[in-house]
């Protein structure tokens, strides 16, 4: 595997700190981070809201390069991606920090961690990709926290994965500015974007972000890149699960992205700062799925609940059950190696390369062998 070109070292910093190109100087002496719309304006030594991007001298640096957490081999459907290399194993991991502040965060122990040293293992990009290859994975996934905040590390890991013949997946909230967005997704093969709700009010009150930026990211991915894109909405009782909001979201996706973009409705569990909200009833997910299908979307799924009907991929031409799933196990696979319905020959949107994998529902934590940090 070819070595990656090391990233420039930052004078006076440790081996986990690299410079970034996403910042600008302000007249008052502060430096503004330009990765996301939050636009943190920092004085010397200050960190942004994400915690992992900080001011050192006349630049913004990433302080978590090569520090990763949660190494685990999962089925790719767990990202969730139902139309991308079905049934195959993916090496999943994250780092620390996040540029959103969701009150309902389901991974808050990682995304809100300030204990980078104790949380994270060390893994350079080449070693990580080689480990994924050795363990039989088809791809790597940046998940648990948002790759937006560690995009330099994510980009290098993705390049190393491609050199090893693997694909790279970003699981993201899509809250990112256009220049950083172009850089991050130029290295990715697939993405699942969390569309957390379909009102600006929810984004402001609950996620402390903006809906419009996320919609811009979705339109960019679907219309301006070759990145295979699926969408997830976590339905939170009483906050984003009304018929009207679900219908509006579904109609927007159908009109602006196209009816073939898969949409996943997943169940909320009480966590972080919203422990007083009850779990999502399975009936809510089934109702949302029906509304989205009625709005013209062709591939709508339910998640975090046992719902075989809501997890089955159906040919929209002839009605054949193409991929029958029981949780993350594939019980029937009727898609050709070239991505067509075996019954009628209709194209199935997605990335299909050969027969389905047989990884199943296993979740296998792993350690990265011989950790070292090589920078790019």
Where are these regions (language model features)?
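Iron-sulfur (Fe-S) cluster-binding segments and ferredoxin-like electron-carrier domains
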Residues: 39-63, 107-117, 324-328, 348-355
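Generic structural "secondary-structure junction" signal
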Residues: 33, 42, 51-52, 62-67, ...
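Conserved AdoMet/S-adenosylmethionine-binding subsite of the radical SAM
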Residues: 122-283
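Conserved Radical SAM active-site core
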Residues: 55-190, 196, 360-367
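Auxiliary Fe-S-binding modules of radical SAM enzymes
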Residues: 1-44, 239-376
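Short, cysteine/histidine-rich loop/knuckle motifs that typically chelate Zn2+
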Residues: 35, 49-52, 97-100, 104, ...
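A generic "binding-loop/recognition-motif" signal
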Residues: 46, 98, 199
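N-terminal juxtadomain amphipathic helix
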Residues: 6-89
């Amino acid at each position: 595997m070819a070595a990656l070109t090391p990233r420039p070292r930052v004078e006076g910093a440790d081996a986990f700190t690299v410079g970034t190109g996403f910042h600008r100087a302000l007249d008052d002496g502060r430096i503004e981070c330009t990765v996301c719309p939050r636009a943190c304006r920092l004085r010397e030594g200050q960190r942004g809201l994400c915690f992992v991007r900080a001011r050192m001298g006349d630049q913004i640096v990433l302080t978590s390069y090569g520090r990763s957490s949660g190494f685990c081999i999962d089925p790719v459907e767990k990202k969730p991606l139902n139309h991308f290399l079905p049934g195959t194993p993916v090496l999943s991991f994250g780092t620390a920090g996040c540029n959103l502040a969701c009150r309902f965060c389901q991974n808050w122990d990682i995304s809100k961690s300030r204990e980078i040293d104790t949380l994270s293992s060390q893994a350079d990009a080449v070693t990580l990709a080689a480990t994924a290859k050795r363990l039989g994975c088809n791809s790597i996934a940046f998940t648990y926290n948002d790759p937006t905040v560690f995009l330099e590390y994510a980009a290098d890991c993705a390049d190393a994965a491609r050199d090893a013949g693997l694909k790279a997946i970003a699981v993201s909230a899509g809250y990112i500015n256009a220049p950083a967005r172009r850089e991050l997704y130029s290295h990715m093969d697939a993405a699942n974007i969390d569309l957390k709700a379909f009102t600006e009010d929810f984004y402001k009150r609950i996620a402390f972000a903006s809906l419009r930026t996320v919609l811009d990211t979705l339109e960019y991915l679907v219309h301006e890149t070759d990145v295979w894109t699926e969408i997830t909405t976590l339905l939170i009782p009483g906050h984003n699960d009304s018929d009207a909001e679900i219908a509006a979201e579904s109609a927007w996706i159908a009109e602006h992205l196209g009816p073939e973009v898969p949409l996943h409705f997943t169940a909320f569990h009480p966590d972080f700062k919203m422990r007083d909200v009850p779990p999502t009833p399975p009936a809510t997910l089934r109702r949302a799925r029906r509304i989205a299908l009625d709005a013209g979307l062709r591939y709508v799924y339910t998640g975090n609940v046992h719902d075989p009907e809501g997890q089955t991929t159906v040919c929209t031409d002839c009605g054949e059950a193409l991929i029958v799933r029981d949780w993350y196990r594939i019980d029937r696979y009727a898609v050709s190696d070239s991505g067509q319905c075996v019954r009628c020959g209709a194209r199935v949107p997605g990335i299909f390369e050969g027969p389905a994998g047989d990884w199943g529902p296993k979740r296998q934590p792993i350690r990265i062998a011989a950790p070292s940090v090589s920078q790019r």
